[in-house]
Amino acid sequence: MNPSEVASAGIHPIELCVHSILSSNLEGIYQAITELRESQALLVMKFNQVKKSFMDEQELLQEEGSLKEELARVNQLKKRLDKLTELYAELARKCGAL
């Protein structure tokens, strides 16, 4: 607006300056808020990816824990099988001697 239009509209030049300064600041604030929302959305997406990765790793660790239990059980069964094999060999030897 040129000075004659401002005067005819009944707007004081200082009011126009204040409005201009406040408007540009408000637009900057609005833009900053928009950028913050976008970065917040990206951070939430990254957080969800990290959370999913963490949960997957936790599941793997729990599976490894259950595998350790199963391996211990297999080892116990192997020991029992070895003892039974020895007993069978001894019985076969005794039966062969008869």
Swiss-Prot record:
One of the protein's GO biological processes: regulation of protein localization
Coiled coil: 55-98
Location of the protein in the cell: Endosome
Tagged with keyword Transport: yes
Keywords on record: Coiled coil, Endosome, Transport
Cellular component annotations (GO), alphabetically ordered: BLOC-1 complex; endosome
Primary localization: other
Family, per entry: Belongs to the SNAPIN family.
Job description of the protein: Component of the biogenesis of lysosome-related organelles complex-1 (BLOC-1), a complex involved in endosomal cargo sorting.
Summary of subunit composition and partner proteins: Component of the biogenesis of lysosome-related organelles complex-1 (BLOC-1).
Designated name of the protein: Biogenesis of lysosome-related organelles complex 1 subunit SNN1
Organism of derivation: Eremothecium gossypii (strain ATCC 10895 / CBS 109.51 / FGSC 9923 / NRRL Y-1056) (Yeast)
Gene (UniProt): SNN1
